Amino acid sequence: MKINSIKIGPYIKDTLFFFKRLNIKKPIWLGTSMGGIIGMVLASKYKNIFKALILNDIGAFIDAAPLIKIGGYAKKTVLLDDLASAKEHLKLIYAQIGIKDEEDWDYLTKYSVISTFGGKYKMNYDPAITKGMKNASNQEDVKLWSVWNKIKCRILVIHGMKSQILTKSTVKKMKETKTFDLYEIKYAGHAPSLMNPEEINYVKSWLEKKS
């Protein structure tokens, strides 16, 4: 399965296998960025798979320009001298996620980097993930309107209002086609960390009201 330039078929298969193996039925799915796209595709194909869907700064349309930027960064391996350097690197590349406390940056650093054989640190993700993305010159806008229109479960959209991935115009158009709850985070871009107490409390409150 391919959504424009993003290949998500393996993620869909893995998720369905995971649900079946652990006998998970009608969970609430909270997906950030690509995780949100996977959730939307699942909800559109399997009408009763989720009790509710929470989309963290992702929607029915993504402009190509920020995807080119993300793809270019993800393909690079940056080596960092120590954890302090790693923390400063994360503060630079994740400046828009809205983290306020140093303790949260420490936590993010702990789980975002791994040590290398040379004693340095690098980002803890599989660089092969970029193989599913097109070259910058061929990158297209990602259009998920047909997927979005088929979703039937309850939806909360979390919008980092400084985001280039989920723009105000996209949110407006999404509202024209479907009813959903919207949580706007003014100080964040792509994508809100959901680590600040006010963010956590909002999501918890929404879940309690919808249970």
Regions found by a protein language model. Give the residues of each.
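Active-site loop/oxyanion-hole signature of alpha/beta-hydrolase fold enzymes
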Residues: 1-30, 201-205
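Conserved catalytic-core motifs of eukaryotic protein kinase domains, centered on the activation segment
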Residues: 1-5, 64-67, 168, 195
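Conserved hydrolase catalytic core segment
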Residues: 22-66
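A catalytic-pocket lid/entrance helix-loop region that shapes and gates access to the active site
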Residues: 58-85
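Alpha/beta-hydrolase
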Residues: 88-153
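Conserved loop-alpha-helix segment in the C-terminal half of the alpha/beta-hydrolase fold
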Residues: 150-188
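Catalytic histidine-centered segment of alpha/beta-hydrolase-like enzymes
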Residues: 188-198
